[in-house]
Amino acid sequence: MLVRLTKLSCPAYQWFHALKIKKCLPLCAPRCSSTSAVPQITTHYTIHPREKDKRWEGVNMERFAEEADVVIVGAGPAGLSAAIRLKQLAAEQEKDIRVCLVEKAAQIGAHTLSGACLDPAAFKELFPDWKEKGAPLNTPVTEDRFAILTEKHRIPVPILPGLPMNNHGNYIVRLGHLVSWMGEQAEALGVEVYPGYAAAEVLYHEDGSVKGIATNDVGIQKDGAPKTTFERGLELHAKVTIFAEGCHGHLAKQFYKKFDLRASCDAQTYGIGLKELWVIDEKKWKPGRVDHTVGWPLDRHTYGGSFLYHLNEGEPLVAVGFVVGLDYQNPYLSPFREFQRWKHHPSIRPTLEGGKRIAYGARALNEGGLQSIPKLTFPGGLLIGCSPGFMNVPKIKGTHTAMKSGSLAAEAIFKQLTSENLQSKTAGLHVTEYEDNLKQSWVWKELHAVRNIRPSCHGILGVYGGMIYTGIFYWILRGMEPWTLKHKGSDSEQLKPAKDCTPIEYPKPDGQISFDLLSSVALSGTNHEHDQPAHLTLKDDSIPVNRNLSIYDGPEQRFCPAGVYEFVPLEQGDGFRLQINAQNCVHCKTCDIKDPSQNINWVVPEGGGGPAYNGM
């Protein structure tokens, strides 16, 4: 049975809008029972199947289904670029192609977070008339600075022409606003954009090719029972499904092994990026200034750095942020607290003094570069943007490459869909030309040139060894060296036992420059329907205490930038239990990446939940 998916008639859409007007429930709520020595956390139905649960007997499990030519998962820069380019080509050649785009955020851009200093190359290719259309590129870079920080001093480092971190010609943007604007352009071209729809499942044809996706169900109690308002998710079928989920996509995890996409690449390595927006004293405001630093407060073996961007947005606004590589080894390290400590540096604090923090957020990012890019195409689908990971790490940019990958995917798909001799060995189209075209583009050339810079930081000199490598080999050879360095394995394998590491004493936040975690999360606008199954699931409820806490001193309580994970005393008897405050989750994916036991599995909550970023 096929039912037309519309914003006005769809029951799931009506339910989603009903959720949006509910009052926010308390941020922290226990997720464990105290009736057992090893408490059981209420887990998702993917772990406890409904067909074995008597409470689901007699519930109508029929799903509405829709047919499209192309379905896109994720309305970020890559997904929107693909949608827009498809519709541009369809208009140019007078073809009728149905493109549906689903986004888990309540509004387009509400889950988007980046620095962001934009290389406009791909954006200008997509929108040659971007100025006439009023695109929100308001702040061209006017000053570009880089420095090494010690605890008390700032050592300037010249940015020579040709080095990857040069920002001449770039724009400082609020990426969420740019994505929102792109969403408007997509809808004007005829793309069907559906915010508040969380893609939860990959669907397959009988021959194993991708058939499309299904959005998640709504109206389920946190104990897994159906509510009276239960609505089944929606199926979206397509000839080609584009996965543009962003870093560490939860759907991509489902088919990486199925299609063996990582057989010929290194493990991906990640960073966690934390960001705040501040309104500062106008006398300190330098619109167009870009500052990047490495060094303090991180040691040389912990990859990371900072940014401070002055935006020209009608008020004295600055974006400050801190990135920590998730291959760090000390389980006592807290990326959030390192960020708060960094703001007290003598070269940073004066800019923020007297100002007001107005927003906070966090998101994981890919740092593996060329060596970690998986196979990009498979029968019925393909990967674009930050999902496979096209970030140019030394350039500290990935939006431009993500956009270009989306455009190239659209062009290859359009060519195959409109071919008069369309042939496919599988029910879902296998668009292999996309990967071939990407490898011939400036994206691949750019990533190949800088491929050795990030892994060069793994040596005995750490980050400083990477800087030396950049200054010698990249400066001379421009990426033409006849070797390719390898990454050292998955980030989840890098933590040392707590007994082998020195605890880190972090200063107490002063409430003016540095802040506590929960007051920070409150500025992210994060909210989830409280009475729903936990979307942060555990494969084994005993592992957090018996392994992570006993060996690594519970690193999840520190690597999470939203206070989701806490070890609290058992209500009865001695010992601790893991409490999951799922309401706090900002969808950064750090837990799914860094958990040393790989016991945490992040799945989508009900559509519309999560952060509500405004131009982050």
Swiss-Prot record:
Accepts electrons from ETF and reduces ubiquinone. Residues 1-32 form a transit peptide. It is an enzyme of class 1 (oxidoreductase). It comes from the Eukaryota. This is Electron transfer flavoprotein-ubiquinone oxidoreductase, mitochondrial. Binds 1 [4Fe-4S] cluster. Monomer. GO terms for biological process: electron transport chain; fatty acid beta-oxidation using acyl-CoA dehydrogenase; response to oxidative stress.
